[in-house]
Amino acid sequence: MEKSGLVAKEGYPFMAIFIGVAAVSSALSWYGIVQFVLWVLAGWCIWFFRDPERHSDAPEDAVIAPADGRVVAIREMEKGPLTDEPVRMVSIFMNVFNVHVNRAPIAGTVTKISYHPGKFVNADLDKASIENERNVLLMESPAGVKMAFQQVAGLVARRIVCRINEGTVLQRGERFGLIRFGSRVDLFFPMDAEISVKLGEMTHSGVTQMGRLKGKES
């Protein structure tokens, strides 16, 4: 699994800017309140891009949370993204205080990635899943089960980062990207899968068990 430092590498440019401006304010002896605010913003930026190690002891067939946040939707759909089969969608909303690094919900091969430009409405709203900028990924597990999930940009988030390509093999819980400054991740479960979470439940990426998949019948 990919190793990471204390913060996600995508945050380095932002941290450099905030820390640089704060340092200049101190060197030039700007007003104390200005220096304080700038250093607070620099600290918040570092905290926002934090990337803690996560481990899960969930069963092998379990689907784990791809993101920190709150479950804001659980509903059935006649057709899932990148497949023609009905699915049950579980949506996780990430606010600006959550860890924003995204992790693979299952182990397997990324068979397709599809980027869709779009709007930037509040990611807490259901319509964000179909109207907003989003990046859809389809994975196939070692048992032959296909599962899609998508990164959705939000009102503040205007940048989806996906570090992988089609054909990439991921371990469950492995980092694959992030979304900057508040966003949403949707999971699309096969209809025969078990869902373990409820509306309003808080999730931790790489840890929380979202449900369980059934192996493909021979």
From Swiss-Prot:
Its EC number is 4.1.1.65. One of its GO terms (cellular component) is plasma membrane. The active site is at S183. Its cofactor is pyruvate. InterPro entries: PS_Dcarbxylase (IPR003817), PSD-A (IPR033175). Binds 1 pyruvoyl group covalently per subunit. The modification Pyruvic acid (Ser) is found at S183. Its main location: membrane. Pathway: Phospholipid metabolism; phosphatidylethanolamine biosynthesis; phosphatidylethanolamine from CDP-diacylglycerol: step 2/2. It holds the Pfam family PS_Dcarbxylase. Keywords: Cell membrane, Decarboxylase, Lipid biosynthesis, Lipid metabolism, Lyase, Membrane, Phospholipid biosynthesis, Phospholipid metabolism, Pyruvate, Zymogen. One of its GO terms (molecular function) is phosphatidylserine decarboxylase activity. It catalyses: a 1,2-diacyl-sn-glycero-3-phospho-L-serine + H(+) = a 1,2-diacyl-sn-glycero-3-phosphoethanolamine + CO2. This is Phosphatidylserine decarboxylase proenzyme. Catalyzes the formation of phosphatidylethanolamine (PtdEtn) from phosphatidylserine (PtdSer). Is synthesized initially as an inactive proenzyme. Formation of the active enzyme involves a self-maturation process in which the active site pyruvoyl group is generated from an internal serine residue via an autocatalytic post-translational modification. Two non-identical subunits are generated from the proenzyme in this reaction, and the pyruvate is formed at the N-terminus of the alpha chain, which is derived from the carboxyl end of the proenzyme. Belongs to the phosphatidylserine decarboxylase family. PSD-A subfamily. It is found in: Cell membrane. The record marks G182, S183 as: Cleavage (non-hydrolytic). One of its GO terms (biological process) is phosphatidylethanolamine biosynthetic process. Heterodimer of a large membrane-associated beta subunit and a small pyruvoyl-containing alpha subunit. The gene is psd. It is a peripheral membrane protein.
